[in-house]
Regions:
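Bacterial Sec-dependent N-terminal signal peptides
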Residues: 1-27
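Generic structural signal for well-ordered beta-strand positions
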Residues: 45-48, 144
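Conserved redox-active cysteine motifs that mediate thiol-disulfide chemistry
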Residues: 51-74
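Hydrophobic beta-strand anchors of alpha/beta hydrolase catalytic cores
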Residues: 56-57, 85, 134
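Structural microenvironment flanking redox-active thiols in thiol-disulfide oxidoreductases
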Residues: 66-104, 118-122
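Short, internal strand/loop/helix patches
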Residues: 98, 102-139
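Thiol-/selenol-based redox modules, centered on thioredoxin-like
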Residues: 130-159
Length: 159
């Protein structure tokens, strides 16, 4: 009887402990976008403060030319539509990143570096293996599209 009590106590401990160790939800279509805060020279950005608005969150890397092309295309579309655009570079070389933002004539106020101390969990929360990934987040904070094309963005967001 005593061994059953110990076994039962161990089972309850494992059950309740494992429920506390769940990983953040994967950033995929239909899931709630992991919230974060990040800053740049223009100020702070908090995803939780964007409720009620469409947000296009783009991660890019200097090592991936296509992500740089996507970044420029997303920026031009966001400027002409009802989308709040946020671009996060995941490279460690912030000097080169700053130069590329200037060369590509990107709106610096929408450009962020993942090297910011507040943003260290963003890469993990969004399960980024590469820098070329973008998320369209709806006004309720739900991910509607991953790596959307420009046509998809136009169809999914109000103009």
């Amino acid at each position: 009887m005593k061994s059953w009590s110990i076994l039962l106590a161990a089972a309850f401990t494992i059950f309740f402990t494992s429920s506390q160790l769940t990983e953040p939800s994967e950033a995929k279509i239909g899931s709630t976008a992991p919230v974060f805060s990040i800053k740049n020279e223009s100020g702070d950005f908090s995803l939780s403060e964007m409720r009620g608005k469409y947000v296009l969150l783009s991660f890019w890397s200097l090592n991936e030319p296509q992500s740089r092309v996507n970044n420029a295309q997303y920026a031009s579309l966001a400027d002409s539509n009802n989308i709040h655009y946020v671009s996060i570079n995941i490279d460690s070389d912030t000097t080169l990143w700053s130069q590329i933002v200037e060369i590509d004539n990107l709106n610096a106020s929408r450009q962020y570096s993942s090297q910011d101390s507040k943003s260290s969990d963003i890469i993990d929360d969004y399960h980024l293996a590469t820098g070329s990934r973008a998320y369209l987040i709806n006004p309720d904070g739900i991910i509607e599209a991953v790596n959307p094309s420009l046509d998809q963005l136009v169809k999914l967001t109000p103009i």
